[in-house]
Amino acid sequence: MQKIVVYVYIYLFVQISVDPVALDGSSQPTENTEKDGLCNACTWRQNTKSSRIEAIKIQILSKLRLEQAPNISRDVIKQLLPKAPPLQELIDQYDVQRDDSSDGSLEDDDYHATTETIITMPTESDFLVQMEGKPKCCFFKFSSKIQYNKVVKAQLWIYLRQVQKPTTVFVQILRLIKPMKDGTRYTGIRSLKLDMNPGNGIWQSIDVKTVLQNWLKQPESNLGIEIKAFDENGRDLAVTFPGPGEDGLNPFLEVRVTDTPKRSRRDFGLDCDEHSTESRCCRYPLTVDFEAFGWDWIIAPKRYKANYCSGECEFVFLQKYPHTHLVHQANPRGSAGPCCTPTKMSPINMLYFNGKEQIIYGKIPAMVVDRCGCS
């Protein structure tokens, strides 16, 4: 229904722009016709921009399968954001936009967003609460988006507090299991020994891909893990439950999953700017600012170039749109006329909090207008 309404508006605008009509039904061109036409075009483009921004907000929530924007304050975000290398890399080296309409970029056919990286923070499980001698950490709940056969990489990141002198640190990651007859409650995942020098604390990553895949295949076996990291004097260096001044130093899981995009068909279109006098269907620049929406739950990008389509699609533009002209010639009565719409769209990468306070790095399809055309 919305598409039909847009088509009607475009059709009416084209008719008014081409042939201004007086109230008595007679055509009355004036010396200001050209100027008025340009003003009308500016007004039309402004309305199109506003509609495009509102549509983008709706599309993002829909494609992320969110009924509403997550209600996460800036203070909470500051506490939840890990001060860790993988997250900082995503933010610092963020590929916000590939605004190159000349190349055959990759894009997905699916409507919903595809997930590439999920950063999961630890929670407390019932099993850990019920245990005697409760372990320090950690239990991770996994998103349904993670399938065991799609996991490319799974890293457990832990932060080790600073040391006062050169020392050797012994790190041990244990997987919790249901108590056996001999009382055993743990099985080893990984042990490592590393040397630390005085200075700031460090982040250490441990490969847990195999364990994660087993958990995904058998969810009931996921009872949590315990993290141990001691120096030569028995001092516990692992930050499992952050203390004062340790916000953002929680352990977390970084999981990367496969994403297999398909190549899109290449076509061509016009590019214009806001000062252009081009009347034909054209792509115009539009920057979407998430901070202006109050969408603090989007970590990156804070803004991106979305672009939009606007302009006329008359049948006289034969050289620019030959296919549309041939269709009209074959069936002149069966077509209401072409409309200016996106003919190629590409995805954006986004780093965001979902409703469960998990950090997701994913790809949202069809969010950038690369080319416009008449169809």
UniProtKB/Swiss-Prot annotation:
<dbReference type="GO" id="GO:0005125">
    <property type="term" value="F:cytokine activity"/>
</dbReference>
<dbReference type="InterPro" id="IPR015615">
    <property type="entry name" value="TGF-beta-rel"/>
</dbReference>
<keyword id="KW-0732">Signal</keyword>
<dbReference type="GO" id="GO:2000818">
    <property type="term" value="P:negative regulation of myoblast proliferation"/>
</dbReference>
<feature type="disulfide bond">
    <location>
        <begin position="309"/>
        <end position="372"/>
    </location>
</feature>
<keyword id="KW-0202">Cytokine</keyword>
<dbReference type="GO" id="GO:0008083">
    <property type="term" value="F:growth factor activity"/>
</dbReference>
<dbReference type="InterPro" id="IPR017948">
    <property type="entry name" value="TGFb_CS"/>
</dbReference>
<keyword id="KW-0339">Growth factor</keyword>
<comment type="function">
    <text>Acts specifically as a negative regulator of skeletal muscle growth.</text>
</comment>
<dbReference type="InterPro" id="IPR001111">
    <property type="entry name" value="TGF-b_propeptide"/>
</dbReference>
<comment type="similarity">
    <text>Belongs to the TGF-beta family.</text>
</comment>
<feature type="disulfide bond">
    <location>
        <begin position="313"/>
        <end position="374"/>
    </location>
</feature>
<dbReference type="GO" id="GO:0033002">
    <property type="term" value="P:muscle cell proliferation"/>
</dbReference>
<keyword id="KW-1015">Disulfide bond</keyword>
<dbReference type="GO" id="GO:1902725">
    <property type="term" value="P:negative regulation of satellite cell differentiation"/>
</dbReference>
<dbReference type="GO" id="GO:1902723">
    <property type="term" value="P:negative regulation of skeletal muscle satellite cell proliferation"/>
</dbReference>
<comment type="subunit">
    <text>Homodimer; disulfide-linked.</text>
</comment>
<dbReference type="InterPro" id="IPR029034">
    <property type="entry name" value="Cystine-knot_cytokine"/>
</dbReference>
<feature type="disulfide bond">
    <location>
        <begin position="281"/>
        <end position="340"/>
    </location>
</feature>
<dbReference type="Pfam" id="PF00019">
    <property type="entry name" value="TGF_beta"/>
</dbReference>
<dbReference type="Pfam" id="PF00688">
    <property type="entry name" value="TGFb_propeptide"/>
</dbReference>
<feature type="glycosylation site" description="N-linked (GlcNAc...) asparagine">
    <location>
        <position position="71"/>
    </location>
</feature>
<dbReference type="InterPro" id="IPR001839">
    <property type="entry name" value="TGF-b_C"/>
</dbReference>
<feature type="propeptide">
    <location>
        <begin position="24"/>
        <end position="266"/>
    </location>
</feature>
<keyword id="KW-0325">Glycoprotein</keyword>
<feature type="signal peptide">
    <location>
        <begin position="1"/>
        <end position="23"/>
    </location>
</feature>
<keyword id="KW-0165">Cleavage on pair of basic residues</keyword>
<feature type="disulfide bond">
    <location>
        <begin position="272"/>
        <end position="282"/>
    </location>
</feature>
<dbReference type="GO" id="GO:0005615">
    <property type="term" value="C:extracellular space"/>
</dbReference>
<protein>
    <recommendedName>
        <fullName>Growth/differentiation factor 8</fullName>
    </recommendedName>
</protein>
<keyword id="KW-0964">Secreted</keyword>
